[in-house]
Amino acid sequence: MNITIFGATGRVGSRILDEAVARGHRVTAVTRSGTSADSVDSVTWIAGDARRHRDVRRLSRGQDVVISATSGPRTGGDELAITARALLVGVAETLARLIVVGGAGPLIVPDSDGRLVVDDPRFVPESIRGVAEACVDQLDVLRENSTVDWTYFSPSAELTAGRRTRRFRTGTDQLIVDSDGTSRISLEDVAVAVMDEAEQPRHLRAVLTAGYSQLVQRPRVVGPANLRRAEVTS
């Protein structure tokens, strides 16, 4: 496939780039400067800005998928929403699919009667609430569009550099948590999940999430009948 990646040198974007190259795709890697220290035959580095719809249109022509892994300021604001609008306008004419990598803020907390992650201090401390709210606005912009084939990737609450395990669970609009209540995934497995969706789209105009989830092992309940059976066979 031909893929354009905005934010290709960021924490997430650089790993998506590596994953795409490893899978044999041709990548147009977009940064503000258009330069990178890496040199790979299947990657073309070019300058561009995802906030400018003309740049998005120019860099999505002839591409199968456009992936945006740009970030916004920790204080929040409207930059992510502005970028989402520019991306939608830019790919509308080229018919490329759009995958936007956002944050966990818009996801629903399990067993919470619809409470969003952005409103749960267990996952979003006050110091990053601004950017979490910006991610909610970012998704709202996408949801208003019914013509572009977009996917919003909303990761687990905790993102860390780690290993590429490919052992994670995917879902839609609900936060994935482990048996101890944590929500986490490695940046490397985020790249795997995003590229899986790029290759085999299953979440068109929808949210995709991914995270580690170990099922709680429930103790076996031994009833009177089982006890009698055990006594007979012992």
What positions do the PLM features span?
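Short, polar loop motifs at secondary-structure junctions
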Residues: 29-36, 156-157
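Conserved beta-loop-beta element that borders a ligand/cofactor-binding pocket
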Residues: 139-161
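Substrate-positioning beta->alpha
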Residues: 134, 182-195, 206
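Glycine/proline-rich active-site loop of Rossmann-fold NAD(P)-dependent oxidoreductases
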Residues: 112, 145-147, 160-167, 197-206
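NAD(P)H-binding glycine-rich loop region in Rossmannoid oxidoreductase-like domains
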Residues: 4, 34-94
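Conserved Rossmann-fold NAD(P)-dependent oxidoreductase catalytic core, especially the SDR/UDP-sugar
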Residues: 26, 34, 85-130, 136, ...
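N-terminal Rossmann NAD(P)H-binding glycine-rich loop of SDR-like oxidoreductase domains
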Residues: 3-23
